[in-house]
Amino acid sequence: MLLGKRQRPPINRTTSLSEIKFDLNLPSESEPSNQQKPTVASPYGSNGQAVTAAVDQNRGFLDQRLLSMVTPRGNLRRHSGDFSDAGHFLRSCALCERLLVPGRDIYMYRGDKAFCSSECRQEQMAQDERKEKGKSAAPAKEPAVTAPARAKPGKGRAAAAV
């Protein structure tokens, strides 16, 4: 008997975009084309219409099938690093105020606090725990409201009602 993690079945690969076949009534790849295959910098021409390219997919150029799937707005898929609309809390560490550098790990706490290191994050967690303990201990230390003391006849002492 082996200790540790149990064996898992291998992960089956899904079909990628290059393996999907589309029937778009375009000329087949077997038809002869020009010897010079143009490279296309943009999938749209100057007038906004889609440009069709007869280029070889194996050489890494754009393919007609892929160009026909592009939306007219030109919103091509981008990486998350391309978006500069990051929240203001992702610019600097919430504890030490260092700038958070793109490409480095960011440690999050409570969903809206970003930290440059796990140590800063841990320190903030400790500070929050101290605040929470202080809040929960504060109501117990409050003085109790007392009724005016009444002297019992014959004893001469005042007793406070609690």
Curated annotation (Swiss-Prot):
InterPro entries: Zf-FLZ_dom
ZnF segments: FLZ-type: 88-132
Tissue specificity comment: Early expressed in hypocotyl and cotyledon. Later expressed in old or senescing leaves and in pistil, pollen and filament of open flowers.
Induction entry: Up-regulated in response to prolonged energy depletion. Up-regulated by the glycolysis inhibitor 2DG. Induced by abscissic acid (ABA).
Compositional bias segments (type: Polar residues): 27-47
Record carries keyword Zinc: yes
Start-end of Low complexity biased regions: 147-162
GO terms under cellular component: cytoplasm; cytosol; endoplasmic reticulum; nucleus
Disulfide feature: none
One MF term in the entry's GO annotations: zinc ion binding
Pfam families linked: zf-FLZ
Span list, region Disordered: 25-47, 121-162
Keyword field: Cytoplasm, Endoplasmic reticulum, Metal-binding, Nucleus, Zinc, Zinc-finger
The keyword Metal-binding appears for this protein: yes
GO biological process: response to starvation; seedling development
Phenotype reported upon loss of the gene: Reduced biomass and lateral roots and shorter primary roots.
Compartments (UniProt record): Nucleus; Cytoplasm; Endoplasmic reticulum
Quaternary structure (record): Interacts with KIN10 and KIN11 via its FLZ-type zinc finger domain.
PANTHER family, A to Z: FCS-LIKE ZINC FINGER 5, FCS-LIKE ZINC FINGER 6
Similarity comment: family membership: Belongs to the FLZ family.
Name by which UniProt lists this protein: FCS-Like Zinc finger 6
Species of origin: Arabidopsis thaliana (Mouse-ear cress)
